[in-house]
């Protein structure tokens, strides 16, 4: 398990975030190289197995039934269709397949049974499986574990203070409780947030601090950049500067030396050169495929060309390192 190895205060994380950029990148890169094989990148493929019609009011989400967006509710995908998509992605280089469903929480019904079969099928193909299914009970989490689920995504989105301004239908403590349920069942936790929603730098630091104060660090920390969607309350938000994105990536790497730091939604905003800087600064995971739920992502062929250009290798599935993280102040 990726256990918490040192105490991080808000002030300490703030100092890291505000470090002069060359020093920040150097420190983050040294930590990355100390804990992961060089030039290795995890490629994850995301499948929206149940799109639209969610009852939650997340201000950033096109899948909420409360907003007038171009996303229409769709029935849950068939098992065979999901397995076909996963097989194609794995053949194209993906080593983790993420299954996302637009609903508030898991129900004990035939849909959950289908998800368990999807997990078993994809795991048998040799890929890690991650699910983002909302809140769940200990019993459901145990069933997911027994089916072979590798990781469970449940983002905190932002700091607890800012969270209240973007979501009212689910409490911050509900999200923390879900993380506890997942951890207790033995499933790895994937948890990060979104930048560019109107939050402050202190909110971004607060999110990292909340995660750093947990008993176990997340196995993966996705850093998403808001993709403003017409019809949502955040449709007019400005995209954060590249330097804000880079600082967030580097700080996450330093605070979570053994975690996968994922350059997630919003990567399509970045040039190959900017993405390269993010990889140097600690990002070692991306989403691979043209679509992320309801928003565009980089073309898979373009990503393959980028990896070849940079001399990067696909990180094999089930290859999480067991070494202890670097303990020195400078690594």
Swiss-Prot record:
Ligand binding ([2Fe-2S] cluster): 98, 130, 190, 262
Sequence positions that bind [4Fe-4S] cluster: 54, 58, 61
Cofactor(s) needed: [4Fe-4S] cluster; [2Fe-2S] cluster
UniProt-listed Pfam families: BATS, Radical_SAM
Catalyzed reaction equations: (4R,5S)-dethiobiotin + (sulfur carrier)-SH + 2 reduced [2Fe-2S]-[ferredoxin] + 2 S-adenosyl-L-methionine = (sulfur carrier)-H + biotin + 2 5'-deoxyadenosine + 2 L-methionine + 2 oxidized [2Fe-2S]-[ferredoxin]
Domain Radical SAM core intervals: 39-264
Keywords, ordered alphabetically: 2Fe-2S, 4Fe-4S, Biotin biosynthesis, Iron, Iron-sulfur, Metal-binding, S-adenosyl-L-methionine, Transferase
Recorded metabolic or biological pathway in which this protein acts: Cofactor biosynthesis; biotin biosynthesis; biotin from 7,8-diaminononanoate: step 2/2
E.C. no: 2.8.1.6
EC class of the enzyme, as a word: transferase
Function as written in the Swiss-Prot or TrEMBL entry: Catalyzes the conversion of dethiobiotin (DTB) to biotin by the insertion of a sulfur atom into dethiobiotin via a radical-based mechanism.
Subunit structure comment from the entry: Homodimer.
The protein, known as: Biotin synthase
Lineage: Bacteria, Pseudomonadati, Chlamydiota, Chlamydiia, Chlamydiales
Name of the gene encoding the protein in the UniProt record: bioB
């Amino acid at each position: 398990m990726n256990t918490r190895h040192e105490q991080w205060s808000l002030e300490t994380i703030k100092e890291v975030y505000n470090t002069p950029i060359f020093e920040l990148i150097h420190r983050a890169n040294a930590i990355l190289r100390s804990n992961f094989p060089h030039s290795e990148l995890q490629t994850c493929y995301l499948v929206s197995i149940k799109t639209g019609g969610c009852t939650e009011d997340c201000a950033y989400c096109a899948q909420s039934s409360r907003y007038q967006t171009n996303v229409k509710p769709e029935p849950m995908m068939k098992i065979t269709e999901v397995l076909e998509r996963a097989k194609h992605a794995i053949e194209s280089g993906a080593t983790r397949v993420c299954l996302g469903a637009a609903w508030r929480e898991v129900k004990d019904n035939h849909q959950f049974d289908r998800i368990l079969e999807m997990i078993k099928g994809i795991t048998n193909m040799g890929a890690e499986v991650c699910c983002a299914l909302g809140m769940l009970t200990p019993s459901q989490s145990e069933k997911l574990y027994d089916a072979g689920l590798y990781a469970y995504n449940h983002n905190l989105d932002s700091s607890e203070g800012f969270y209240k301004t973007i979501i009212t239908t689910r409490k911050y403590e509900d999200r923390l409780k879900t993380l506890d349920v997942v951890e207790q069942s033995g499933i790895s936790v994937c948890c990060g947030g979104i930048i560019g929603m109107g939050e402050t730098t202190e909110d971004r630091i607060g999110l990292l601090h909340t995660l750093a104060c947990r008993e176990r660090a997340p196995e993966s920390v996705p850093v998403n950049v808001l993709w403003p969607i017409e019809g949502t309350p955040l449709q007019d938000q400005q995209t954060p500067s590249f330097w804000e994105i880079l600082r967030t990536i580097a700080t996450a790497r330093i605070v979570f030396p053994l975690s996968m730091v994922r350059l997630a939604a919003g990567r399509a905003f970045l040039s190959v050169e900017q993405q390269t800087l993010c990889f140097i600064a600690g990002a070692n995971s991306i989403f691979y495929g043209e679509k992320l739920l309801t928003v565009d992502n980089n073309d898979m062929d373009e990503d393959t060309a980028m990896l070849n250009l940079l001399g990067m290798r696909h990180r094999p599935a089930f290859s999480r390192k067991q070494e202890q993280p670097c303990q020195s102040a400078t690594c």
